[in-house]
């Protein structure tokens, strides 16, 4: 259960980063999303 919740939480977090990058609609937003995603 713990592992499953971790995976599910990661997917949701990743989707939020992608949405943020798309919402910004700029290279800066995309780069920030990739940097944050890479750290996590």
From Swiss-Prot:
One GO cellular component term noted in the UniProt record for this chain: early endosome
Q: Which domain of life is it from?
A: Eukaryota
**Cell compartment(s), UniProt:** Cell membrane; Membrane; Perikaryon; Cell projection, Growth cone
Enumerate the UniProt keywords alphabetically. Answer: Amyloid, Cell membrane, Cell projection, Coated pit, Cytoplasmic vesicle, Endosome, Membrane
Q: Where the protein is mainly located, per its record?
A: membrane
Site entry (Cleavage), positions: 7-8
User: What are the recorded Gene Ontology BP terms?
Assistant: cognition
Pfam families listed in its UniProt record: Beta-APP
Report the membrane topology from the UniProt record: Single-pass type I membrane protein
PTM comment: the record says: Proteolytically processed under normal cellular conditions. Cleavage either by alpha-secretase, beta-secretase or theta-secretase leads to generation and extracellular release of soluble APP peptides, S-APP-alpha and S-APP-beta, and the retention of corresponding membrane-anchored C-terminal fragments, C80, C83 and C99. Subsequent processing of C80 and C83 by gamma-secretase yields P3 peptides. This is the major secretory pathway and is non-amyloidogenic.
The record's annotation in Gene3D superfamilies points to: Amyloidogenic glycoprotein, amyloid-beta peptide
**Which family is this protein grouped under?**
Belongs to the APP family.
Known role: Functions as a cell surface receptor and performs physiological functions on the surface of neurons relevant to neurite growth, neuronal adhesion and axonogenesis. Interaction between APP molecules on neighboring cells promotes synaptogenesis. Involved in cell mobility and transcription regulation through protein-protein interactions. Can promote transcription activation through binding to APBB1-KAT5 and inhibit Notch signaling through interaction with Numb. Couples to apoptosis-inducing pathways such as those mediated by G(o) and JIP. Inhibits G(o)-alpha ATPase activity.
> How does the annotation summarize its subunit structure?
Binds, via its C-terminus, to the PID domain of several cytoplasmic proteins, including APBB family members, the APBA family, MAPK8IP1, SHC1 and NUMB and DAB1. Binding to DAB1 inhibits its serine phosphorylation. Interacts (via NPXY motif) with DAB2 (via PID domain); the interaction is impaired by tyrosine phosphorylation of the NPXY motif. Also interacts with GPCR-like protein BPP, APPBP1, IB1, KNS2 (via its TPR domains), APPBP2 (via BaSS) and DDB1. In vitro, it binds MAPT via the MT-binding domains. Associates with microtubules in the presence of ATP and in a kinesin-dependent manner.
Q: What is this protein called?
A: Amyloid-beta precursor protein
Q: Which gene encodes it?
A: APP
């Amino acid at each position: 259960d713990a592992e499953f919740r971790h995976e599910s939480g990661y997917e949701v977090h990743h989707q939020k980063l992608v949405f943020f990058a798309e919402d910004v609609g700029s290279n800066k937003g995309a780069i920030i999303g990739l940097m944050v995603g890479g750290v996590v």
